[in-house]
Each structure stands twice: as C-alpha cells, then as structure tokens.
Amino acid sequence: NPGPGGWAWVVPDGPYAAGYEAQTTNQRMELTATLEAVRTFAGPLLVVSDSTYVVHCFRDGWWEKWLRKGWVNAKKEPVANRDLWEPLIEAVRARGNVDFRWVKGHSGDRWNDEADRLAVEAGTLQTDLSG
C-alpha cells in the first residue's frame, strides 16, 4: 500500500513526536515510529505497539535469525525494510532495556489511539509534529 503516510510515538501524559513520508507503507511507518522513540529516550523503555510486525520481531527473536541467515526470512527471501530494521535492531541492542508489548489497534487504548491520530495528522498534513 505505498503512498503518503505518517508515524508517531506518544509518552502517556508526556511528550510526543510525529512525522511523515510522501511515499511509504504502514509497516515502514511502524518501524520509523519505533526507531524514533528508541533513539529519543535513554533508560528503560516499554514500546507498546499495535504492530505485530515490530513486536514479534523482538519478542520472537526474528532479528537474531535474520542476522544468522544473512538477512533472509523464513521463506528464504530478503527481509523487507532492512534499511530500517538494521538501525532499529542496532539501537535496541546498543541501549538494552527495551521491552515490547502488543496492543490491539483501534480498540480504545487511549495512547495507541493518540499515536494513531497523530500519525494520520502528520501524514495528511505532510508535516512534523511534536509536543
């Protein structure tokens, strides 16, 4: 589903940031949001995401298999979005203390809904947001 898109991260009752790309996919935006959050904060971090793509990679150790097998997936195909996965995996490994938890999207989770709203706004307006 290439097209314009937005990403966002939100700290409950705290800061937030959002951005956009003119041509992207939802998976790339989920990765970008996670990478930006991991790069922004020091210390222990809990990433709560509605992206099984991101959460399962770390929870189930996909990334370790990718590194061992030369960046091919279980289907023996090149891992998609490697240009974002590599810096994200490197950042998570370098800092440690990053945990991942999945939350169902559009299910009434206040902060997931807020991140989604900000991502849609950034993508629609083609602008960066922060606060």
Question: What are the language-model segments listed below?
Answer:
Residues 120-131:
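Acidic, His- and aromatic-enriched active-site or binding-groove loops in soluble protein domains
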